[in-house]
Each structure stands twice: as structure tokens, then as C-alpha cells.
Amino acid sequence: MSHLAILPTVLRDLELLVGALEGLDLQPERDSRVIGFAGEAQPVAVAIRLQDGQQLGWRRQQDGSLALVGDLSRLSRRHDLPPLLGEITRAYAARLALREASAHLPGAELTVVS
């Protein structure tokens, strides 16, 4: 039996996460729900739907971090999940680095080149 699981992450900024997801053409949906086995649902701040229809979402934790929400039993069968999560994390980190750099270098023009 599969069910939705909530995993802690180091991500904290929802806007940076949404920007990273959009940059990867993952079409984030704000204020959504992730649906798991037998209709089990968890509200999330943002969700994406993968090509096979499975969902990943992120919800705010009490400590301010964004926890990953998904049906891990089903998602663990996907061989592309670890690389995808790595891409999302790298895109988030790049946006965070640009934001921090622009805060320390007012007037500088900074862009991401991939």
C-alpha cells in the first residue's frame, strides 16, 4: 500500500522554488493538493504533475522550511526522480545565489546562463 509521505528539505523560499520549477518547465500550481493512494490528499503550497500523472508538492513546515510531499512508494519506482530533484535543488540554489549576490552588488546586472 502506498501513501503520501512528507520529507524535510533545505528549501525555504516559496517564490524561489516556484521560479526554479517554472525555469525547468514543470508548471507549478500554487495552493494545490497532492493526491495519493485511494484518494488520500495533502494540501501543499505548490505542486507539479510529472509526465506519468504522479505529483510532487511542497508544503510549509513550522520551522519555515518547505517539505517535499509525494507518494514515495510509487515515486520510488521512477528512475528519473533523483536527477529531477537534483535539478530542482540546483535551480533553486542558483536563484538564491543570484538574489544574495544582487543584494551585495547593487546596480550589478546578474543573469543565469545554462
Task: State the predicted function of each range.
Residues 1-114:
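Interaction-mediating elements
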